[in-house]
Each structure stands twice: as C-alpha cells, then as structure tokens.
C-alpha cells in the first residue's frame, strides 16, 4: 500500500505535548521535508516567546474548529488569555464537539459577528484586552469596527497587514506587506506600511539590520509603470529619514529581491538583493497572490498580523490551520510585550 504524503500543519504538537506532559503521537505518512524546514523558523520564534507574559485577547466569533482551537492552543502555550466573544450557544457547541472545557475561559455572548467585533473593539479601547484575534468572520467585518472613526482603534499611523513567511528555499523568515488591508495604497500610505513592517521585524529579528525590497515588475524607474515611481520615492525617503531603521531599495523585481544570482546576472548592485527581510507589494492584489502562491505551491508557513492600530490584531485567513494561528498570536505577544517595555524605559528616563 502506498504511503500517504502529508504536510503536517500541526507542527507544534510535539512541543505542546512536552509542555503539557502528555504523549505525542506523530502523524502517519511521509512528512513534507520542505514544510518541516520552513516550520523550524516559527518553532524558534515560539520558543523565544516562552516566558513572556500572556496577553489578554478578545477572540471574535470563534464558532468553528480552527478559530476556537487556535485560541485554545495559543492559551495552552501561555501566549494569550482568550476572551471568547460570539453566540454563546455556538461557541459551546463547537467546544463540546472538540472536547474543549470552557470553564477555563471567559465567554461573552454576542448574537452576531458584527456585534462580536464591536464588543472586542470596546474592550480594547477600555484596555480590558491587549489584542484582538479574528475568528470565523470576514476580514472586512472585523476591520470595519477597528477603523470606525468614532469608536475605532485608529492611531496616527495607517493601519496595514503583514504576513510573516518562511519557506525552505530561503534562509530566514520574511514579511510580505500589504496583502490584506490596503487595496491601492498611495505613496503616503506605503510609507506607513513600510514603517509598520520595519518596526515589527525589529521586534522579532535577532540580527537588527533590516532590509526592505519595494517590489514592482521591473527594477528600473519608468513612468509607464507607476509603482516603480513609488518604489524609487520610498527608497529616497529612507535616505532622508522619512522611513527609519532600515535599508530600503526599489524598485526591485521579485527575483532580484530574493536571489543575489538573479540580481548580479542583471547587473543590479543592491544591498537588499538576495537578503530581503521585507517585501513590499505594489498593491493588495499582487501581495495576496504572492503570499498564497508561496503557501500553496511553495509549502510556506505563514502568520498574519495587523499593525498600526492601538492593539495588535491577529488576522489570518479562514482557511489557515490551527498552528499558524498560534504563531500569529506569538507575533502579537512580541508586539505587546516589547511596546510595553519600550514605554516603561521612556517613562523612566
């Protein structure tokens, strides 16, 4: 009988079993080596988060297996303290089916998903929670409550989304932004998108040198492709201090950003080529396509987070497996704990 070829998307099971003192039963079949290699980067990130204070997190509309167990598993790793907001009878039903004891978690009843999103934002504004986690609802439904002008969570920064990605064929994790929030960002929007991603990368990267590749279809500046003009402007803005704490170069085509060989073959001399930490997409469509191509064709492991709001917002695709939701919670934990530490240092000076 032919063995089944699998991708073990519950790659945190063994670590969790050790943490809880339970028996680990590995999945049957042949493991996907590329996926496992990529997952090692995220396992390292999880281990680095061990010891950080868990953050109280409003989980919005967790009425399916993935959204509920994603929050529960993150709680088992002591990354978050979930506050489950949604129709209580539906939460209880999915908990019963998946053998989750809700006695350990606070549940706030909300009849509909939009009401759950509104309540989560209210808790964040009152500082009763330190993060928000998307459950089984549409992104625009959650983000409408977040960006609402009267009672939302806006700051002076443009809100943006970042995917943290890892693939076996690239030596380190990298960010793709923005692939979920800003559809056709202006130059000013892109400045904030880039700065948000830089700030995140500094929180999670042990080597503090951050390199940003601003992507377009070509590596030369031409008015025929307006995104090359934006890329060139962003690069110069970094030179002038309008974008801080990173080397920014663009326009760069994807191959030139990822492959030093491709850049050298085209005669491109860039400090970013082959060593990018952040890939800035021209628009949402191209960024979303790039991230999902890497996930489904390149066996990428990915986590998603919304930046620039008053609290980190854990935002993944509804099709994302449980462990990728856990790693997204880890990103929120890094943001919360390091921001809190920075504010403490500033207050003591």
Swiss-Prot record:
EC assignment: 2.3.1.8
Gene3D superfamilies given in the database record: Isopropylmalate Dehydrogenase (3.40.718.10)
Pathway listed: Metabolic intermediate biosynthesis; acetyl-CoA biosynthesis; acetyl-CoA from acetate: step 2/2
GO annotation, biological process: acetyl-CoA biosynthetic process
One protein family per Pfam: PTA_PTB
Entry similarity comment: Belongs to the phosphate acetyltransferase and butyryltransferase family.
Protein name per the record: Phosphate acetyltransferase
């Amino acid at each position: 009988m032919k063995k089944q070829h699998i991708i073990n998307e519950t790659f945190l099971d063994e670590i969790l079993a050790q943490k809880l003192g339970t028996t680990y039963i590995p999945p049957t079949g042949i493991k996907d080596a590329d996926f496992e290699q990529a997952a090692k980067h995220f396992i390292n990130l999880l281990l680095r988060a061990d010891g950080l204070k868990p953050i109280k997190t409003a989980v919005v509309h967790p009425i399916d297996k993935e959204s509920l167990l994603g929050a529960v598993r993150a709680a088992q790793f002591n990354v978050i303290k979930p506050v489950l907001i949604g129709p209580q009878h539906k939460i209880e039903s999915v908990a019963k089916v998946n053998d989750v004891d809700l006695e350990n978690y606070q549940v706030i009843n909300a009849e509909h998903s939009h009401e759950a999103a509104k309540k989560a934002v209210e808790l964040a504004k009152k500082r009763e929670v330190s993060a928000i986690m998307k459950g089984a609802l549409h992104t625009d439904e959650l983000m409408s409550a977040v960006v609402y002008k009267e009672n939302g969570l806006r700051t002076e920064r443009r809100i943006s989304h970042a995917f943290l990605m890892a693939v076996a064929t690239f030596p380190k994790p990298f960010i793709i932004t923005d692939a979920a929030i800003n559809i056709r960002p202006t130059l000013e929007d892109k400045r904030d998108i880039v700065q948000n991603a830089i700030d995140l990368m500094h929180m999670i990267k042990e080597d503090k040198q951050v390199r940003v590749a601003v992507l377009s279809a070509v590596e030369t500046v031409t008015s025929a492709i307006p995104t090359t003009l934006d890329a060139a402007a962003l690069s110069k803005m970094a030179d002038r201090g309008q974008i801080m704490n990173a080397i920014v170069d663009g326009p760069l085509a994807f191959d030139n950003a990822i492959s030093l060989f491709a850049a050298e073959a085209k005669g491109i001399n860039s400090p970013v080529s082959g060593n990018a930490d952040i890939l800035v997409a021209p628009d949402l469509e191209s960024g979303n396509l790039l991230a999902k191509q890497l996930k489904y064709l390149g066996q990428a492991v990915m986590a998603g987070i919304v930046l620039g709001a008053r609290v980190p917002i854990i935002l993944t695709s509804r099709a994302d497996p449980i462990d990728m939701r856990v790693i997204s919670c880890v990103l929120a934990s890094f943001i919360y704990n390091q921001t809190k530490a920075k504010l403490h240092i500033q207050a003591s000076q």
